[in-house]
Amino acid sequence: MYDINPIYNDVRLYFNEAEHKYTDTFNNQYISTTTLLHEYAPKFDKKYWLKKKSAELGISEKRLAQQWQDITEEACARGTKIHNGLEDGIKTTSMFYDAIQHIPRNDNTMTTVADINTIDQYIKPIVLDEFIKFTENKYPKVYEIFDYYITNGYKIYSEIGVFLPNLLISGTIDILILREDRYLIGDWKTNRGGLKFEAGYYKKDRTQKPNQLTDVWVPKKDVLLPPVNHLPNCNGSIYNLQLSVYAFMVETILGIPNAGLWLCHIDSDFVLNEYGMPKRFPDGLYHVKKNPIEKVTLFKMKYLKKEVMNILSDRRKVIAATRIQSQSLFD
């Protein structure tokens, strides 16, 4: 049994999929961890870049905006398909779907780490052979990781919620590897360009139409916003902070220490250009090969607890100001 923080005794988290909104038992609205952290990244001036890039490419802003939207939608669909395959494999082979039937819930109730004592007795260690079969033997490196932790007495949870009721922050952990004395957190990423841990960009070959990415990396002196302005402005920094916020939430709920954080990048095996980079086709999109072989790269991450505490201090001030403002409306 886990010693669940008593602040979770009377509060549950709900997710309205149609409105994409998180609330709790008391109808408080939550901000997702992802949304919160993107407030610390310099804002992308879409209007400016549409005007600049459309002029460079000789196409209308409307057409370029649609190409950007198509790329985003394709990436989301591809990422969701990979995430769902891994999630279903874990939940099916660990009896998770049966276990959550023991939680009093309505249709919008999220299963969270605060429910661990209710469901843990019904969760079984993943049957690795079944998981490998379920995921079509595509991720040998993932199987090695899971085998190690299963052998050492851990249970593996997928897509499980976490939240901080006092700060109205929520999130969903891709992979929670849990034992009664410690835990680890993992996350799947499917970015076309991979993970970067420094600010910068790849130079483009503008002699081709459409322009093609080259393998020449151009570093930039670009950082996140205070109080994390010592971190480079790149997806690796945001993802590291995301995992670290989740780790703090799990510690808050269960009171046990973190034993590790990792990001697992799954490359979809795109058609490559002459520079070895994903090729952009005349339709403006990047195409996956007909018979793709997905490649897994694992990144061990630091627990940025100090940075998390600074971000949560900011959030605490926002919550306090909101409550003061709300009270003044009724004074």
Name each model-derived stretch.
Residues Q66-Q69, E73, P226-C234:
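Short coil/turn segments at secondary-structure junctions
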Residues H83, I173-F197, Q212-T214, K220-L224, ...:
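Conserved catalytic cores of phosphodiester-cleaving nucleases, focusing on short active-site segments
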Residues T111, D115-F131, Q208-V218, V223, ...:
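Low-complexity, serine/threonine/proline-enriched polar segments
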Residues G161-F163, L176-L178, C264:
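A generic structural motif
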Residues F163, T190-G193, S268-D269:
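Short, solvent-exposed loop/turn segments at secondary-structure junctions
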Residues P165-N166, S170, E198-R206, V223-H230:
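Gram-negative outer-membrane beta-barrel domains
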